[in-house]
Swiss-Prot record:
This is Interferon alpha/beta receptor 2. The gene is IFNAR2. GO terms for cellular component: plasma membrane. Keywords: Cell membrane, Disulfide bond, Glycoprotein, Membrane, Phosphoprotein, Receptor, Repeat, Signal, Transmembrane, Transmembrane helix. The keyword Repeat applies. Phosphorylated on tyrosine residues upon interferon binding. Phosphorylation at Tyr-340 or Tyr-519 are sufficient to mediate interferon dependent activation of STAT1, STAT2 and STAT3 leading to antiproliferative effects on many different cell types. Residues 1-26 form the signal peptide. The lineage of its organism: Eukaryota, Metazoa, Chordata, Craniata, Vertebrata.
Length: 530
């Protein structure tokens, strides 16, 4: 609730704290009418302008136009017409520039006409200093966070009059807040011609303040206050917003710091950062472009690995052809399923392929070229015909007893050519599986020059020539209990298997033939191991 209070005393000692501000220029004053009672004359100041107005008491008389005359009582002069108020239709006249002396008494005369006839004459007298009330000036208020600014606007049409009159008036600003009223008195001089600002501080937060501005005349009854203008003072709203913004900034900064520290710890734990120098190169991310643009992995390096086969020397028994030594040293054959007997044969073998580089290491005493030395022998006839084995035999061997010898040929794998390249004194160890059902044994003649033709199931055209006992003694195959597997030749060098070879002869032929000297001559067909 806004309250207003009139100021009865004039002076700086009569300032009382008030919350409402009121600045009043004065109250309108109606001058007494000295003429007849046909009119009522009024003198007012509107925005520091002296305006004389009149009103007819008899409303039945309606003049069409008016003319204003005036004179000064102290000068005893005739009536003067006001140039701006001749034959005017309005009921007021501006005398700001005409009545300039505030110490003289002016006597105005208003004449009303209807066409050329006078209808009414009104007269009066006015003393400007006591009788001229001042209207309140225009003002604006602006609320800030810690104060309120009051901007008072003076509109002076006649600065000369104000310079003489305002020095007799005091300007007040009343401040209303609730039931309390506080009056402020700004310092105003008589030569004020411009606007001025007044600051009201030390305000209570969240309080509604209303301001009024007025001029206080000598007569307290003539105070004319301006309408109130109010504003709500809320300084804490901005402070609360600033505090909330500060708290929000602190929380945001804390969250960003926590996320950053957590990310760094996670990256360090999984090994993407803070890597040790001795880690593999695949874990070192020195180039950021590698992370963004993935590059193709480098090609794998191919290194040549040399595989060296070590041929260990096996113990070779001193084999002789005596009956006793042969019986003692002869290894008992190992029987396996399928009707096969496993014999351990020890000796130096040479491949039959002419393209194998291991032929260079074989001496002429131990092996001979089948294509160069062995003549083609015709197939035996009658009972001495050698049957062909049904299995895929890759070996050819010849068994001897007493004064006869057996020479075998071996197909080697080209990958083992380097291993077979050894000196003449090195010997290997070979293990064969022999199918006794496919072995053809025949009796050899006593003549040393006789020949035995051995037919291999895989190569029926290949023949073996008997050689002298003295020249082939070193290549005799000795039976042994242990053996090693020989490398095999390339399948491209093997002879094709004949499909039309009869298999019934091997079943009817006698596998063992007694030579009469205690030895049994066998024709052995060796099989390739996979």
């Amino acid at each position: 609730m806004l309250l207003s209070q009139n100021v009865s005393a004039i002076g700086p000692l009569n300032l009382y704290p008030m919350v409402h501000i009121s600045l009043v220029f004065g109250i309108s004053y109606v001058a007494p009418v000295l003429s007849d009672e046909h009119c009522t004359l009024k003198m007012r100041f509107r925005n520091f302008q002296s305006v004389l107005s009149w009103e007819l008491k008899n409303h039945s008389i309606v003049p069409t136009h008016y003319t204003l005359w005036y004179t000064i009582m102290s000068k005893r002069e005739d009536m003067k017409v006001v140039k701006d108020c001749i034959n005017v239709t309005r009921s007021f006249c501006d005398l700001t520039d005409v009545w300039v002396n505030t110490t003289d008494m002016y006597i105005p005369q208003v004449v009303g006409f209807r066409e050329n006839a006078k209808l009414v004459i009104c007269m009066g007298s006015f003393f400007l200093v006591p009788d001229k009330p001042l209207d309140p000036p225009e003002f604006e208020i602006v609320g800030f966070t810690n104060h309120i600014s009051v901007n008072v606007k003076f509109q002076f049409d006649s600065p000369g009059i104000l310079s003489e009159e305002l020095q007799f008036y005091l300007a007040f600003i009343e401040e209303h807040a609730g039931n309390s009223v506080k009056r402020h008195q700004p310092q105003i001089t008589g030569n004020i011609t411009k606007n001025f600002n007044y600051v009201i501080d030390k305000l209570i937060p969240n309080t509604n303040y209303c301001i009024s501005v007025y001029f206080e005349p000598k007569d307290p009854r003539k105070i004319n206050r301006s309408p109130l203008k109010c504003t709500l003072f809320r300084p804490r709203r901005e402070s609360e917003s600033s505090e909330s913004a500060t708290i929000g900034g602190i929380i945001t900064l804390f969250l960003i710091t926590a996320v950053f520290i957590s990310t760094v710890m996670i990256l360090k734990r999984i090994g993407y950062i803070c890597l040790r120098n001795d880690f593999p190169k695949v874990l070192n991310f020195y180039k950021l472009s590698v992370w963004v643009f993935a590059e193709l992995p480098p090609l794998e390096k191919v290194a040549t690995v040399e595989v060296i086969h070590v041929n260990r020397k096996k113990k070779v028994w001193n084999y002789n052809y005596d009956d006793e030594n042969d019986i003692e040293n002869e290894a008992a054959p190992h029987l396996i399923s399928g009707g096969y007997t496993k014999h351990g044969l020890t000796g130096k073998l040479c491949p039959t392929s002419t393209t194998s580089p291991s032929l260079e290491d074989c001496s002429l005493e131990d092996c001979s070229e089948p294509s160069a030395e062995e003549p083609y022998l015709p197939e035996p006839k009658g009972d001495a015909e050698t049957p062909m084995a049904p299995g895929p035999g890759l070996w050819q061997s010849e068994g001897t007893s007493g004064g006869y010898q057996t020479r075998g040929t071996l197909w080697q794998d080209p990958t083992s050519e380097e291993d077979s390249d050894s000196t003449e004194g090195s010997e290997g160890r070979i293990v064969f599986n022999v199918n006794l059902n496919s072995v053809c044994v025949r009796a050899l003649e006593d003549d040393k020059d006789s020949e035995v033709t051995l037919m291999s199931p895989s190569c029926p055209e290949e023949t073996v020539e008997l050689e002298d006992l003295n020249e082939t003694e070193s290549s005799v195959l000795v039976a042994s209990e242990e053996g090693t597997q020989l490398p095999f030749t390339n399948p491209s060098t093997e002879c094709p298997r004949p499909q039309d070879a009869p298999s019934d002869k091997s079943d009817t032929s006698d596998p063992d033939v007694d030579m009469g000297d205690g030895y049994i001559v066998r024709q052995v067909n060796l099989k390739k191991f996979n």
